[in-house]
Regions:
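Short, small-residue-biased leader/transition segments that mark boundaries at the very start
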Residues: 3-4
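Hydrophobic alpha-helical positions that pack around
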Residues: 27
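A generic secondary-structure signal for well-formed alpha-helical elements
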Residues: 31-39, 159
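Charged mid-protein connector segments
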Residues: 43-87, 92
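NUDIX/MutT-family hydrolases
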Residues: 70-75, 81-90, 99-104, 109, ...
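Short helix/loop capping segments that flank catalytic or ligand/cofactor-binding pockets
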Residues: 95, 114-116, 202
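Core RNA-modification/binding signature centered on pseudouridine synthases
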Residues: 146-203
Length: 203
């Protein structure tokens, strides 16, 4: 089934669909983009008179007054994974007190929807290509954590967002391996090693 395929792509035998649903929910909560279609097959238009209604749904989601499935039932929507693909799987280094096991996805922006950050989890947003974003990080103009810079590096080889989405959709089952970075000091400098790097297993 399609559900089972979505799980296997993430290397999971059970519970994998929840990651895809969480991705869609987070996109809607944090940037106002709802990756869904009407049951009739019609695409969502959040630039028209429906915008204020869906803005209210978004506020209620953020306040935990409803969940994403409530929105689907109320508006006869089907959550869509057609413009989403898994990108990477990161695990927080062991020395951190707060640790996460996080899946990253890429999503292609649907037509007739406007990006608007929520002002809480995301306080600023802009359109920028990966090369320029990495340059700004290197120059100290943008602060980025390691998973962000590495995810951006993986975007650089593609000519367009759709090229990258098409490539990621071809990923076979369990192809995305978890990345648990390891850090150590060498002559006073911090060194980071990734799985597969020489010396990784020694630290």
């Amino acid at each position: 089934s399609d559900v089972y395929k979505r799980q296997l792509i993430l290397g999971l035998n059970d519970g994998g669909l929840s990651y895809w649903v969480a991705c869609i929910r987070e996109c809607f909560e944090e940037v106002g983009i709802l990756l869904a279609t009407k049951k009739s097959g019609e695409k969502l238009n959040l630039e028209d008179e429906d915008k204020s209604k869906f803005d209210q749904y978004r506020k209620m989601l953020i306040n935990n007054e409803i969940n994403i499935l409530d929105v689907c039932k109320e508006e006869d929507l089907i959550l869509s994974t057609s413009n989403i693909a898994p990108l990477s799987h990161w695990i927080t280094p062991e020395f951190e007190t707060r640790r996460y096991d996080t899946r990253f996805f890429i999503a292609y922006l649907p037509e007739k929807q406007i990006v608007q950050h929520d002002g809480m989890e995301l306080t600023k947003s802009l359109w920028i290509n990966p090369n320029m974003a990495l340059k700004k990080a290197l120059d100290g103009e943008m602060q980025m954590i390691l998973p962000t810079t590495e995810n951006l590096k993986s975007c650089m080889e593609f000519k367009s967002a759709m090229d990258m989405l098409d490539n990621q959709k071809k990923i076979s089952n369990n192809e995305i391996k978890p990345i648990l970075p390891k850090f150590f000091k060498d002559n006073g400098n911090w060194i980071v090693l990734f799985p597969g790097d020489e010396g990784y297993e020694d630290h």
